[in-house]
């Protein structure tokens, strides 16, 4: 995919990346389907280490197996057997790890955690709140279903309300 007129978005990603080395960053990227959100982030990080978690419509345990393999491959960290591991356990592990090294984590189709296990959002809130002040993490989440992304991040009754440090809406 070729990128045209994404300099503004790349500059914003660069600023966020730089900040994340000092203080934890939580960025939301929204925009309609097939507009290039995923490819834009992947292109920006093509020469940097980035964990990429795609939230497929699978069981949580199956997703965790895939996420653990991504951690092993990209960070070269031996991790215990992932059998029975939850996303909360993996996210906590990453947040703990980010206290000693910078990590960029990109979670794609973030709204689909609703189908996997809606309590993941509460778990993330608790873990984020407990670790963000000591972490050097660049957490990027992207979603294509605006109604769900708005519910997750803009509804005062939802656990991740107000947690983001940046929001990017990608237009054609």
Show where each model-derived region lies.
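Phosphate-binding site recognition
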Residues: 1-172
């Amino acid at each position: 995919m070729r990128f045209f007129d994404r300099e503004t978005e790349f500059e914003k990603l660069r600023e966020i990346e730089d900040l994340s080395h000092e203080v934890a960053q939580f960025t939301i990227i929204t925009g309609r389907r097939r507009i290039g959100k995923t490819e834009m982030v992947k292109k920006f990080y093509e020469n940097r280490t980035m964990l990429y978690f795609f939230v497929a419509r699978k069981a949580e345990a199956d997703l965790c197996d895939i996420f653990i393999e991504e951690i092993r491959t990209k960070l070269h960290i031996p991790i215990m057997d992932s059998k029975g591991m939850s996303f909360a356990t993996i996210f906590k592990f990453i947040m703990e790890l980010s206290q000693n090294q910078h990590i960029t984590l990109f979670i794609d189709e973030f709204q689909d955690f609703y189908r996997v296990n809606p309590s993941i959002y509460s778990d993330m809130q608790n873990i984020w709140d407990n670790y963000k002040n000591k972490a050097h993490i660049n957490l990027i989440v992207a979603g294509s279903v605006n109604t769900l992304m708005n519910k997750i991040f803009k509804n005062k009754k939802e656990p991740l309300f107000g947690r983001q440090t940046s929001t990017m809406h990608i237009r054609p």
